[in-house]
């Protein structure tokens, strides 16, 4: 018998060619996307994004009977104005953080809980690629469910005659939604990779810290994601109707470039920190 025939499993593992970071991320993405789409979280997500669709149907039904679903200072708010309010209050202020918390914190925590993380880490792939691949799957999964909901709400509320004038603003709103999912997902991916009880910490951050600091005067709000994300909303809406109402709710509205710079900085920094945490942390599986 030769020495090679007595090689240990780890020696055989070491002899395998190591996949590149990009190729490994793509492989993990392919495997994770199907699992996410058919998971219980997707059912929860469908129920969450179904709320605005149901509300839009109610508004449409009210307006079909000649009544006004929303008035501001005695003036009727048009269909796209109602859509803008729903984008701000329901999607950006609630749905995006909720999905970021429940999906982002679970990217690595679920693997630890299911005791499958050892299998992933024994493959000849960079550890960080596991997180990036699962993060990309999270983005694809949430966008595949959330964006159709937004489009349904838009076409229910906005008259066909107003679509040519408002479709550009809709695209900006969809961009804000995508950016919000990306940034919250990146932040909570780090929380899930670094902390032991990530869901609790994520909920406290999104619906505790952010909500309290936004309501308080001072500079602390500048260290929240919601401050920069919601500050972009007036820029994404037409300069009439409900825009003045929304702008009145913001004591401070930073320039667009400042908001985008901070949001992309949050995204890059926390994804990098999450990747480093996965590469360096020693995960201990509970019996």
Which ranges hold each PLM region?
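Membrane-interface helix starts
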Residues: 33-48
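Hydrophobic/aromatic residues in alpha-helical transmembrane segments
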Residues: 100-104, 117, 152, 184-187, ...
């Amino acid at each position: 018998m030769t020495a090679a025939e007595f090689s240990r499993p780890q020696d055989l593992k070491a002899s395998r060619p190591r996949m590149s970071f990009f190729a490994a991320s793509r492989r993990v993405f392919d495997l994770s996307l199907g699992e996410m789409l058919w998971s219980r979280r997707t059912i929860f997500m469908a129920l969450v994004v179904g709320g605005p669709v149901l509300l839009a149907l109610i508004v449409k039904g009210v307006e079909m009977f000649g009544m006004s679903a929303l008035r501001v200072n005695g003036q009727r708010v048009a269909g796209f104005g109602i859509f803008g309010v729903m984008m701000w209050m329901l999607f950006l202020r609630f749905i995006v953080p909720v999905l970021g918390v429940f999906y982002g914190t679970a990217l690595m925590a679920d693997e630890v809980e299911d005791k499958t993380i050892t299998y992933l880490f024994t493959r000849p792939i960079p550890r960080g690629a596991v997180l990036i691949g699962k993060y990309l799957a999270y983005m694809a999964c949430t966008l595949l469910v959330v964006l159709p909901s937004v489009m349904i709400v838009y076409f229910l509320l906005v008259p066909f005659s107003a679509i040519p004038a408002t479709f550009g603003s809709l695209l900006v709103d969809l961009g804000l939604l995508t950016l919000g999912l990306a940034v919250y997902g990146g932040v909570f991916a780090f929380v899930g990779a670094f902390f032991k009880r990530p869901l609790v910490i994520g909920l406290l951050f999104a619906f505790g810290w952010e909500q309290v600091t936004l309501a308080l005067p001072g500079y602390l709000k500048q260290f929240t994601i919601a401050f920069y994300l919601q500050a972009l909303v007036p820029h994404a809406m037409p300069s009439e109707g409900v825009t003045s109402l929304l702008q009145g709710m913001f004591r401070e509205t930073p320039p667009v470039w400042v908001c985008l710079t901070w949001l992309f900085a949050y995204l890059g920094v926390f994804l990098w920190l999450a990747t480093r945490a996965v590469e360096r942390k020693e995960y201990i599986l509970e019996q």
